[in-house]
């Protein structure tokens, strides 16, 4: 029998991330969504670092300010008459809050594989409930379900386990800055494949 000790913050963070991420991309393109997501994650992790009395370095602040200016410029001027980008922005900020919480929680993980597995197991009912409450009118095929399981449940879980393995060795501000590579990768891959 495998004993699974779940962590409430890990489950909460992963649930917010998955639900916000899923619904946010109905309104946003991949590159813009990832910029909002990881810019927001940076704010959450910087705030956590400051609140825990670990002051960011000058280099950290420069990176943070540059990222925030980039996000503001990306969305300026913002069309307040269109609800679609605002919905996407709000949902992606919810995902950012969730991933920030999940990442901060990972800095304390003693067993990354077990932590990730228990977080996924306890997140599944929350995510399924959100799909029932907010159906998104998609058609499911067996092949599509298979691909979702392979990419989402298996590959993401392995990636999240790796992230939880690395996190204890990084300062929160460095972990936040490292994640700013994701939007660049997402933009490049979306230009190639989408």
PLM segments and residue spans:
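Specific transmembrane alpha-helical segments of multi-pass solute transporters/efflux pumps
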Residues: 2-33, 37, 73, 152-170
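Juxtamembrane helix-entry segments on the extracytoplasmic side of multipass membrane proteins
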Residues: 2-4, 61, 76-98, 132-150
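Cytoplasmic-side transmembrane-helix entry/capping segments in multi-pass membrane proteins
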Residues: 3-12, 55-68, 88-89, 110-121
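Hydrophobic/small/kink-forming positions within alpha-helical transmembrane segments
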Residues: 11, 15, 19, 39-46, ...
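Helix-helix packing/entry segments at the starts of transmembrane helices
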Residues: 33-40, 106-123, 156-192
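C-terminal transmembrane-helix exit sites in multi-pass transporters
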Residues: 40-65, 184-194
């Amino acid at each position: 029998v495998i004993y699974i000790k779940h962590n409430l913050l890990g489950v909460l963070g992963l649930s917010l991330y998955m639900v916000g991420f899923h619904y946010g991309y109905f309104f946003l393109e991949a590159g813009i969504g990832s910029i909002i997501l990881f810019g927001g994650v940076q704010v959450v992790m910087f705030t956590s670092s400051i609140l825990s009395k670990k002051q960011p370095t000058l280099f950290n602040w420069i990176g943070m300010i540059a990222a925030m200016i980039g996000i503001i410029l990306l969305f300026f001027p913002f069309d307040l008459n269109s609800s679609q980008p605002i919905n996407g922005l709000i949902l992606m900020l919810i995902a950012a809050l969730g991933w920030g919480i999940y990442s901060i929680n990972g800095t304390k993980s003693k067993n990354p594989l077990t932590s990730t597995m228990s977080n996924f197991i306890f997140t599944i009912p929350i995510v399924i409930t959100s799909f029932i409450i907010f159906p998104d009118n998609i058609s499911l095929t067996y092949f599509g379900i298979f691909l979702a399981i392979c990419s989402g449940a298996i590959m993401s879980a392995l990636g999240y386990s790796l992230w939880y393995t690395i996190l204890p060795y990084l300062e929160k501000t460095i972990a936040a800055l490292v994640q700013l590579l994701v939007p660049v990768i997402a933009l490049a891959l979306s230009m190639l494949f989408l």
